[in-house]
Amino acid sequence: MSRTVFCEHFQKEAEGLDFQLYPGELGERIFNHISKDAWAEWQKKQTMLINEKRLNMMDPTDREFLEKQMTAFLFEGKAPEIEGYTPPES
């Protein structure tokens, strides 16, 4: 049986994550307030950020940058700026 959460990203009830995917308090907040769809959308943005900015996940500074981008995207509705990317027109 799937969990339902009020997704802070989409501002609606949606299917929640199956388990906590990120450590610590932030991970708990994501688990309780972010839907599977919002998390999947973030993973696409995260991959683009890592590739375009050539982030090294072994570097604490790069991990901190990515965490700030994730928080802004999931909870504040701020899309990350990715150089050279033009979103498709609806």
From Swiss-Prot:
Per the record, its GO cellular-component terms are: cytosol
InterPro entries, A to Z = Fe_traffick_prot_YggX, Fe_traffick_prot_YggX_sf
Q: Which PANTHER family match?
A: FE(2+)-TRAFFICKING PROTEIN-RELATED
Q: What is the lineage of its organism?
A: Bacteria, Pseudomonadati, Pseudomonadota, Gammaproteobacteria, Alteromonadales
Q: Which Pfam families match?
A: Iron_traffic
Which protein are we looking at?
A: Probable Fe(2+)-trafficking protein
Family the UniProt entry places it in: Belongs to the Fe(2+)-trafficking protein family.
| Alphabetized UniProt keyword annotations | Iron
Domain of life, per UniProt, equals Bacteria
The species is: Idiomarina loihiensis (strain ATCC BAA-735 / DSM 15497 / L2-TR)
Q: Name one GO biological process term.
A: cellular response to oxidative stress
Q: What does this protein do?
A: Could be a mediator in iron transactions between iron acquisition and iron-requiring processes, such as synthesis and/or repair of Fe-S clusters in biosynthetic enzymes.
Molecular function (Gene Ontology), one example = iron ion binding
